[in-house]
């Protein structure tokens, strides 16, 4: 039978139909589709999406470590280092002056503006008293100013410096000041002093003397006491004897202020020692050289230490410097030989007493007054 005969064609079609029916029976099978099995658990579940489920990481696998949280470090506050503050020459607080002044190179008594003074920026009561030749306490009392002696710019003060007598070297002194005070101390500046015609004499600090409760700045090497010579045109410059007459009771006798060796003698030349220095031990007694009244007891100035000044009469004063302990107070009456202090080394480099005698404000050699020993 040829391939193109009708019988062959029918047979072929029938065979193909049987194959199609068989295939259709396979697709209509009642067996459910194979389940999708989870990799990790093995349990079955149906899915309609046909998407693969990504399994979680297996136990024992090293997970990616999360970044560790670093502790927050707070900045450590370093202690502030205190820097030295340069003292400003002038500070103003509520219109008032707060001013710390060094008097080392400021001439005293140089004001010649009359009996009043107008406060300027930078002034203090101490400074005004200094340049007008007054004691700051008297000046405060005269102008009703109480401690701490605050001033206002433009304030007018009564300084009592009506005469305004100039002194060679830029210093000045008035008779009003001379009548009020009579304390004399040391200096290393040379000048000519005009002496007021009053029984009590006061000299400017720049010329080797000072008003009550004031001392000169330290212009001398440590351990050396220096006082510039003073020329007083209105009084005799010849050194008097201890028995010289005076307008007040004469001093009958002088006595040594302490025991010990004289280690520095009086020097009359310019820049020389205007007293004597006596060596001793700390705590050694120092006594008044004669009867008198204490007009100064303090330590307001570097280089002189604890200083006591005694006024014996209108002409004579004695000074005791570098004391360790002062046993008297200002305005106290003392007797010759009375213990007034103990020896020390305040304001100097070694234990000693610097002792001076002044006659009408002029330094004289204490050895000419003290008894021989």
Swiss-Prot record:
PANTHER family: MUREIN HYDROLASE ACTIVATOR NLPD, PEPTIDASE-RELATED
Protein name per its UniProtKB record: Murein hydrolase activator NlpD
One Pfam family matching this protein: LysM
InterPro entries in the cross-refs: Cell_wall_metabolism_enzyme (IPR050570), Dup_hybrid_motif (IPR011055), LysM_dom (IPR018392), LysM_dom_sf (IPR036779), Peptidase_M23 (IPR016047)
Ranges of biased composition (kind: Low complexity): 36-50
Region annotation 4 X 7 AA approximate repeats: where it falls in the sequence: 199-246
Topological relation to the membrane, as annotated: Lipid-anchor
Single GO cellular component term: plasma membrane
Function: Activator of the cell wall hydrolase AmiC. Required for septal murein cleavage and daughter cell separation during cell division.
Domain LysM: 115-159
Lipidated residue numbers (N-palmitoyl cysteine): 26
Entry-linked CDD domains: LysM, M23_peptidase
Keywords assigned: Cell cycle, Cell division, Cell inner membrane, Cell membrane, Lipoprotein, Membrane, Palmitate, Repeat, Signal
Lipid moiety-binding residues (S-diacylglycerol cysteine): 26
Sequence repeats: 199-205, 221-227, 233-239, 240-246
Major location category of this protein: membrane
MF-aspect GO terms: metalloendopeptidase activity
GO BP, one annotated term: cell division
Family: Belongs to the E.coli NlpD/Haemophilus LppB family.
Subcellular locations according to the entry: Cell inner membrane
Signal sequence region: 1-25
Residue segments, region Disordered: 30-70
SUPFAM superfamilies recorded: Duplicated hybrid motif
